[in-house]
Every structure is written in C-alpha cells, then in structure tokens.
Amino acid sequence: MSTTRMISDNERRFVDYLNSSFMPFWRRTAFVYKCELAFSILILFCAFAELIFYDCFVIFFLMIIASFVFVLLYLEFYFGSVYNCPALLHLHTLSAAFMSMVCWLSVLIPIFFGESIYIASRYVAHVIYKYYGCQVIFGSLLTTFAAASFARRKEIKSVELSHVDYLKRLMKLTSKVAEDVQKEAKSFELELLDIHSYS
C-alpha cells in the first residue's frame, strides 16, 4: 500500500480556487491603483489652482512632487498586481510606508517642538495650514495604500506556496505509482511486444 498521502478532491478544488483567484484580480485590486491615479490627477489640478488663484509657489511645488509620487506608486501597484510580482508590491509597500512616515513626521515634529504659527502673518499662516492639511491627507492615503499592497503580496505568496506544496505531493504520488507499476510488471513477467511481428 502506498505510504504517500493521496491528494483529495477538496485539495484539488482548493488549488483550482487559488488558480481562479488570479483571474479576477483586476476587480479586487483595480480600486487601489485607480485611486492612486485619480489622486495624482486631482493633486495636479489642485497644484495649478494654488498657483493661479493664490500665487503660492511653495504649495504648488509640494503638490507637483506629491502628484509625481502617486504616479510612481500607481505604476508599482499596477504592474505588481497585473503580473503577480511580489517584488514590485514589496517595493510599493516600502515606498508608501516610508513616505507616509515622512508626511506624519513633518506634521508632528513642529508640533512637538512647540512651533507656533500665531505670530506669523496671515499669508504665512495660510500656507502653513495648507501644508499641514496636505501632509495629513497624504500620510493617511499612503498608509492605506501600503496596507493594500502588503495584503496583496501576502495573497500572492500564499498562492505560490500552495502551488508548490500541491506539485510536490503530486510528484511524490506519481513517482510512487510508477514504482508500483514497475513492480507489478516484474511480478507478472510482462515482456515487450515487437510491433514489427504483426506486419
């Protein structure tokens, strides 16, 4: 009797489910990279609005950088999800998490050091308030996107490990069956037939 554990129908169905989970990935992950692309376009429009209506070059420059960052994150998450590339998703997670930390520190450090904007002029206070608001919004969004790419990467890794485990057990099973067939052929003393003798 074979000592190799047979692959059950439930396991086959599970692997089929994991295979099919790759098919509709754009339905489950499209929301994330579409949001990144939409935010990059929205931030770009807001940047030009700041330049045209408020003539504020500081906020305009920061928003242009933020728009470019969201475009890069969009490309990383899009290609990482479409081609099931854990390396790109890992890069997306690290990039988004690092930039989120920078955004939050740029807001929290001035507060912890007790810098006050009440002594500033109205124009400077307006710029600082917008700067703080943008950093808080960007930090929150980047944290969310980092969590999404991390979850997607874990999902791909689990599918890959399931495939490897399934293939290993399948190879063990087929090798054991081949050994059993060879033993039975020897026990019955089966001989190869010469097909040319029938011509």
From Swiss-Prot:
User: What is the protein name for this chain?
Assistant: Uncharacterized protein F46C5.7
Q: Which organism is it from?
A: Caenorhabditis elegans
Q: Where in the cell is it found?
A: Membrane
- Print the keywords alphabetically: Membrane, Transmembrane, Transmembrane helix
The answer on whether this UniProt entry bears the keyword Manganese reads no
Please give, as recorded in its UniProt entry, the membrane topology of this protein: Multi-pass membrane protein
Which GO cellular component terms, listed alphabetically, does the Swiss-Prot or TrEMBL entry include?
membrane
Primary localization: membrane
Membrane spanning segments where?
35-55, 57-77, 94-114, 131-151
